[in-house]
């Protein structure tokens, strides 16, 4: 199969007009992943997103939470949409040809442990304690694991229980955004806004905009101030429900946010507020 391989090895001079470190990528013919596990599935990649962490790797700025836990070379791509190509004999509820969205997490269950670590036991597999152990190479997600491959290849493998069938009403483009949106939705559900609360979203890239959508879905009455860098980002933030827009290139951000909080208080409402940092999902 064809796949984009990411390695620390450089494959020639990228030239002055290329992206930083683009020479660490190459298109190559590689074997289809053959992780023989009767509870896993082989998936044909349809769309794979380019995450901020992927861009960081290409620019030589690895994600601190993930970089120590995998070894090059890898096939990137963890924002996944695909079509099932083959099933392990113990996989149930799925069929060949089915479109699926994939949770790329590789935690205790995926690594073959029957007794989960404390984080997995409490529903937090994203911070599993065993990301270097078990039946898989060290990695936190599909797309950083040697055995699984990733969405930047024609095929990859995934656990059957991490595959979620998609209805026909959801198109491929929308479905390709499910993984990053779920990250935002989880953050909002962990710290849901109160009624009419002012929530400040710092950043209006893809994750910032998805945070706005998630906030409005969970608590439609919350008021959102979005700190945006570019006019087109501000327009999209407004379309998704942001009532207040802060221009990070011209406004004094925290002063402007303080003014918004005080204005809410002047209306006789409690000026409580919280902040979402879209770049790191910290709240």
Which functions belong to the PLM regions below?
Residues 67-69, 108-202:
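NAD(P)H dinucleotide-binding glycine-rich loop of Rossmann-like/cofactor-binding domains
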Residues 1-79, 150, 154, 158:
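Short N-terminal strand-loop motif that marks the start
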Residues 268-283:
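Rossmann-like NAD(P)-binding element
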Residues 161, 167-251:
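Mid-domain Rossmann-like dinucleotide-binding core that forms the NAD(H)/NADP(H) cofactor-binding site
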Residues 31-48, 63-121, 167-169:
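Glycine-rich beta-strand-centered segment in the early N-terminal region that forms part
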Residues 102, 201, 247, 276-277:
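Redox-cofactor binding/interface segments in oxidoreductases and associated redox assembly factors
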Residues 252-270:
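Short amphipathic alpha-helix with an adjacent loop that forms part of the alpha/beta core around
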Residues 98, 197, 243, 270-273:
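Conserved acidic residues
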């Amino acid at each position: 199969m064809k796949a984009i391989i990411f390695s620390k090895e450089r494959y020639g001079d990228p030239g002055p007009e290329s992206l930083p470190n683009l020479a660490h990528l190459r298109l190559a013919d590689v074997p289809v992943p053959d992780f023989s596990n009767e509870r896993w599935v082989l998936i044909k990649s349809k769309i794979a997103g380019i995450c901020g962490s992927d861009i960081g790797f290409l620019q030589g700025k690895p994600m601190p939470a993930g970089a120590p836990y995998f070894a090059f070379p890898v096939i990137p791509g963890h924002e996944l949409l695909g079509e099932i190509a083959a099933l392990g004999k113990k996989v149930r509820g799925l069929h060949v040809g089915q479109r699926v969205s994939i949770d790329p997490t590789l935690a205790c269950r995926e690594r073959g442990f029957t007794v989960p670590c404390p984080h997995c036991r409490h529903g937090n597999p994203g911070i599993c304690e065993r990301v270097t152990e078990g039946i898989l190479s060290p990695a936190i997600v599909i797309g950083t694991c040697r055995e699984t491959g990733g969405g930047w290849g024609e095929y990859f493998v995934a656990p059957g229980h991490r595959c979620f069938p998609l209805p026909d009403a959801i198109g491929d483009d929308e479905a390709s955004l499910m993984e990053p949106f779920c990250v935002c939705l989880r953050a909002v559900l962990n710290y849901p806004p109160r009624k009419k609360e002012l929530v400040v979203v710092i950043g209006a890239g893809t994750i910032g905009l998805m945070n706005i959508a998630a906030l409005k879905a969970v608590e439609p009455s919350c008021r959102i101030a979005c700190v945006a860098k570019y006019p087109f980002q501000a327009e999209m933030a407004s379309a998704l429900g942001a009532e207040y827009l802060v221009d990070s290139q011209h406004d004094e951000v925290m002063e402007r946010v303080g003014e918004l909080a005080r204005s809410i208080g002047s209306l006789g409402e409690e000026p409580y507020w919280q902040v979402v940092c879209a770049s790191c999902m910290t709240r």
